[in-house]
């Protein structure tokens, strides 16, 4: 079993437990260059999302080095997804790190979302 398959296996276990609880989840996906965060409902509908590909996020990151593959960009994405979720009336979610370690950019998304008012 290689590294990617192990990550996907861990992600499946997390998603199965969250599906059993029937709560909204904050799903995070990370690539080398970008980070994506989505609030997904129990019926698998996307209720709010944010990523480093959004024009507003890219404008805020324009003065910094890198395009979005850093902790500062991840924190900005976490803050934006929390703001969108609160605007949609979602205050509480389960954190789905998709098998990624809770470290670096994934941790930055979670902490920024908590600071912006989202409860895990």
UniProtKB/Swiss-Prot annotation:
It comes from the Bacteria. One of its GO terms (molecular function) is 5S rRNA binding. Pfam families: Ribosomal_L18p. GO terms for biological process: translation. One of its GO terms (cellular component) is cytosolic large ribosomal subunit. This is one of the proteins that bind and probably mediate the attachment of the 5S RNA into the large ribosomal subunit, where it forms part of the central protuberance. PANTHER family: 39S RIBOSOMAL PROTEIN L18, MITOCHONDRIAL, LARGE RIBOSOMAL SUBUNIT PROTEIN UL18M. Belongs to the universal ribosomal protein uL18 family. Part of the 50S ribosomal subunit; part of the 5S rRNA/L5/L18/L25 subcomplex. Contacts the 5S and 23S rRNAs. This is Large ribosomal subunit protein uL18. The gene is rplR.
């Amino acid at each position: 079993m290689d590294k990617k398959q192990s990550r996907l296996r861990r992600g499946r276990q997390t998603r199965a437990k969250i599906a059993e609880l029937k709560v909204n989840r904050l799903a995070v996906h990370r690539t080398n260059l970008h980070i994506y965060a989505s609030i997904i409902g129990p019926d698998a509908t996307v209720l709010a999302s944010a990523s480093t590909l959004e024009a507003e996020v890219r404008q805020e990151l324009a003065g910094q080095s890198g395009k979005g593959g850093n902790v500062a960009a991840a924190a900005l994405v976490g803050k934006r997804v929390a703001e969108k979720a609160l605007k949609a009336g979602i205050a509480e979610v389960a954190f789905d790190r998709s098998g990624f370690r809770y470290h670096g950019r994934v941790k930055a998304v979670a902490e920024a979302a908590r600071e912006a008012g989202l409860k895990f």
